[in-house]
Amino acid sequence: MTQAELGELIARRMTDGGPPALDIGCGLKRAEPGAIGMDWSEESGAEVVWDVDRYPWPLPDGVFGRVHMSHIIEHMDDIVRGMKEVHRVCRTGADVFITTPHFSSHNSYTDPSHRHHLSAATFKYFTDRRFATFLSPRCGFDLVGVELTFGGNFVLDGLGRLIARRSLKWYERRCAWILPASDIRAHLRTL
C-alpha cells in the first residue's frame, strides 16, 4: 500500500466514526473490526507491511485513537523506541492495549524470537515523567490498568490471581516462580 492509499484509508476510517485503530503485529486477525493492520508478513493481509524495528514507521503523526499490540512488544529490538513511535502515531488521549507473556510464563522463553521478558512493572516505566523527558517533552503515557492472566490449573491459578490482584509487586517478587502467570495485559493512554 502506498502512502497515498494509506492516507485515503485513514481518512475513510475517520469519517466512519472517530479516529481509526491500529493493530501492530496483527497477524491474520485484527483485534477489532476496521483496525488498520501493520505486520512484517505479507501473508497477514496487513494494510501496512513493515518491520516494527525499522524507524520511523510509515504512518502519519497523531492519527490513531486506539492501538493494539498483542504478543509483539517482546519481539521488538528496542521497546523504548517502539513506544515512542506508538506515541507519535497516536492522538492525545489514545488508548494503547498491550498483551505480552509474563516473565514467569514458560511461553516467554519457548519462542526463540522473544528478545525481552517483561513484568507488570515494565509498563510503569512509560508513565514516569523521566520517560517523557528522556525521549521528548511530548511523549508520555498514563497507566490506566495492568493485570495478569493465568491459565492451566484452576486452584493454583486462582491463588496466583488473588495474590496478584492484592499486590502485583509482592506477587512478582515473591510468588511468580511458584504460581506463574500467563500474560500481562496493560492499558496505557497517551498524554
List PLM regions with ranges.
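Residue-level marker of positions within ordered structural domains that often coincide
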Residues: M1, K29, D128
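Class I SAM-dependent methyltransferase Rossmann-like catalytic core
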Residues: M1-R13
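Intrinsically disordered, low-complexity regions
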Residues: E8, G18, A35-M38, F141, ...
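Conserved SAM-binding loop
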Residues: I10-S104
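S-adenosyl-L-methionine-dependent methyltransferase catalytic module, highlighting the catalytic core
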Residues: V80-R81, E85, R91, D95-L191
